Each structure stands twice: as structure tokens, then as C-alpha cells.
Amino acid sequence: MHKDELIQLHQLLIYLRKYIEKKYNCDNNEFKEYDELNIYPHHIHRTKAEHIYTIFLLSSIIAKILSDNGKIPRSVSNLLRVSGEKIKKEIQRKRCKIKNTNT
């Protein structure tokens, strides 16, 4: 996907988050890890990889809430979380490589 498409998907997940928060009476602790990233769809200066990681993280949180309420299998949430962690490690690896190159 192109970065602009990822940003649109990210925004769609924000709308879904708001709907799920109302429907299932979620508190902000459910989305704490996502909120702490401080990467939102309007942050177009963020890298494509950062948006991808954020999308996977937000998707896995939404999937966990849905699986807790019997709407989808737990395996969906787990798969999204594992995929997100792989992307996070790749981002960290690239940042380390850039730091080592600059020093």
C-alpha cells in the first residue's frame, strides 16, 4: 500500500475505535499502548513503517476487544499483535543502523 492509503486505513481504524469504545464501554486503558505511541493519521511526517506498526497495534487492540466479547476468534488478535511486533523490531533495527552510520 502507498503511504496515503495507509493513513486512510489508520483513520478508518480511529473511527472504528470510537464506535467500539461506545458499544463496549471501553476505558482508555484498553488503548493506552496505542495512545502512548503518539502517532495519529494526521501525522503525515511519520514514516510509512511507523504508520504500518500503528495500524497493526490498533487493529490488534480492536480485535482483542471483539474477541473478549465473542465476536471474533482470539487467534485473529494474536496474529495481528505478532505481525505488529515484527514491524516494531524492524523499525528499531533500522533506527539503530542509522545511529551507527551517523556516529
UniProtKB/Swiss-Prot annotation:
Note the InterPro entries from the entry.
UPF0058, UPF0058_sf
* Pfam families given in the database record: UPF0058
Q: Using the chain's own numbering, where are the disulfide bonds?
A: none
Similarity comment: Belongs to the UPF0058 family.
PANTHER family of this UniProt entry? UPF0058 PROTEIN MJ1205
Q: What is this protein called?
A: UPF0058 protein MJ1205
